[in-house]
Swiss-Prot record:
It comes from Streptococcus uberis (strain ATCC BAA-854 / 0140J). The gene is rsmG. S-adenosyl-L-methionine binds at residues 78, 83, 129-130, 148. Its main location: cytoplasm. It is an enzyme of class 2 (transferase). Keywords: Cytoplasm, Methyltransferase, rRNA processing, S-adenosyl-L-methionine, Transferase. Specifically methylates the N7 position of a guanine in 16S rRNA. Disulfide bonds: none annotated. It comes from the Bacteria. This is Ribosomal RNA small subunit methyltransferase G. SUPFAM superfamilies: S-adenosyl-L-methionine-dependent methyltransferases. Its EC number is 2.1.1.-.
Length: 237
């Protein structure tokens, strides 16, 4: 997917990038490749692949109408090189973005990236989701939490649901079918007072399958969740 094809694909969804936004995506690509030589951010570095498998893939929540250009608070857990939240921020500048990542090198990259992209309303924190999820400054503070290829839903739900406001939504982006994951996660979702409200299967322009699972928080999360760092992975709910 060349940049021009990327722009055209967005126009099909009535999203028209201005020259500054197009330049932001180009600088994003250049910065990603440059930093990838220093720290391992992605195995995908060919320009057309980055535009398809990172940029286009990341904005799926916008293309499918789950996120609007509004000043909502969005938390991205384990964003790595900034996916999916930074591409969405470029398209919808009103979004207030927070990223938590467990690797400090990635946070350093993201801070530099936000500077060269001239982004405002982006916040980066190094640490574990389990720890931040018990912090009153983060717990129940977000309208939307996104997670792209982070963990199985049984684990991911405990790492993300505590951050949501009541009726807030988790958007889990996956490359594989999640039917079995959702079956395995039934107990976790019940304990966390949350419910799957949609499971959307779609395709990238090249035909690759993708999935967005949307989970809504129905009641306040019990105080004991999330458990201490590492426990959700070792002993899933």
């Amino acid at each position: 997917m060349t940049p021009e094809v990327f722009y055209k694909a967005l126009e099909d969804f009535d999203i028209h990038l201005n020259d500054f936004q197009k330049e932001q995506f180009d600088i994003y690509f250049q910065t990603l490749v440059e930093w990838n030589d220093k720290i391992n951010l992605t195995a995908i570095t060919e320009k057309n692949d980055v535009y398809l498998k990172h940029f286009y893939d990341s904005i799926a929540p916008i293309l499918h109408g789950y996120i609007k250009n509004e000043p909502i608070k969005l938390l991205d857990i384990g964003a790595g090189a900034g996916f999916p939240s930074i591409p969405m921020k470029i398209i919808y500048p009103q979004l207030d973005i927070t990223i938590i990542d467990s690797l400090n090198k990635r946070i350093t990259f993201l801070k530099q990236l936000s500077e060269v992209l001239h982004l405002e309303g982006v916040h980066f924190f190094h640490g574990r989701a389990e720890d931040f999820g018990q912090d009153i400054n983060f717990r129940a503070q977000f309208d939307i939490v996104t997670a792209r290829a982070v963990a199985r839903m049984q684990i991911l739900s405990e790492l993300t649901i505590p951050f949501l406001k009541l009726n807030g939504k988790l958007l889990a982006l996956k490359a594989q079918a999640v039917d079995q994951e959702l079956t395995d996660a039934q107990n976790a979702l019940k304990l966390l007072f949350s419910q799957v409200i949609e499971n959307n299967h779609y395709q990238l322009p090249n035909g690759d399958s993708r999935y967005i699972t949307i989970v809504e928080k129905k009641k306040e999360t019990p105080r004991k969740y999330p458990r201490k760092a590492g426990t959700p992975n070792k002993k899933p709910l």
